Regions:
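C-terminal output helix
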Residues: 105-114
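Short hydrophobic/Thr-rich beta-strand motif most characteristic of the beta2 strand and flanking loop
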Residues: 25-32, 40
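Active-site beta3 strand of CheY-like receiver
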Residues: 44-50
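Charged docking surfaces used in two-component/phosphorelay signaling
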Residues: 15-23
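Receiver (REC) domain active-site loop signature in two-component systems and cognate sites
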Residues: 55
Length: 123
């Protein structure tokens, strides 16, 4: 089973994404900021990351840069945000995101991206 880490400071968003992913058979863990996420990854890297941009202590951009440079450079990551600005999307890709989705992310959209990026058959 694939392991997914949700990195978001909003508990309601983490619960929403967790419900979608667990119902599709993924193993899900959560972190409320980039620092906590990096600590979790040191124990065992994940197969996929869903990362918010605006978080305390270490934002999504900083987390993705650390992930790519030092931990697991090849693991797919989706950055999610309420911001639809092109400059935020460009910054997400520069930081190492494989995709940029606007919140709220639809269940089918999220599962399709995961399936595609993990090379799985349709969920």
């Amino acid at each position: 089973m694939k392991r997914v880490l949700i990195v978001d400071d909003a508990a309601t968003v983490r619960m929403y994404h967790r419900g979608i992913l667990e119902s599709a058979g993924y193993i899900v863990e959560e972190a409320w900021n980039g620092i906590e996420a990096l600590e979790k990854i040191l124990n065992a890297p994940f197969d996929f990351y869903i990362v918010d941009i605006n978080m305390p202590r270490l934002d999504g951009y900083g987390f993705l840069r650390e992930l790519r440079q030092q931990v697991v450079p090849q693991a797919p990551a989706i950055m999610v945000s309420t911001e639809a600005a092109a400059m935020d999307e460009a910054a997400a890709y520069r930081a190492g995101a494989n995709a940029y989705l606007i919140k709220p992310v639809l269940p089918l959209q999220l599962l399709s991206f995961l399936s595609l990026m993990l090379g799985e058959a349709s969920q």
